[in-house]
């Protein structure tokens, strides 16, 4: 229905709200790629909208959730064991939201999600460093640990990375 409204009346006064509802509907339906595309479209069509912060937020959330897949709702899997993929893009989009709209109502949640993602990325890198260490590839393990220390300051895995470098 929202798509039809947009096709028939692309620039009427309800079009902007229909685009926002479409983003939400796609996301709630579990279609993160379509939610992201709809959010990007909204940002392109309405760059000065008072609701642009919501579109940036949903764009980032969609990227964060895109790698999870439907099966992770039913099977508990440690996400730090999987390649982060579009979660990295989501992290940068949360940062863009905070830079553009620091006083947005979505900024506090974006900051929390960035901390979660930073810790997830650090944990992923730590798993790789540990793998290299167990394989006796000490230089590769030290390089990964060094990357954790330099790129993920504040993450709990920094201390574990230091231990790998000391060994």
Language-model features: where?
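Acidic, polar-rich low-complexity tracts and alpha-helical solenoid repeat scaffolds
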Residues: 1-167
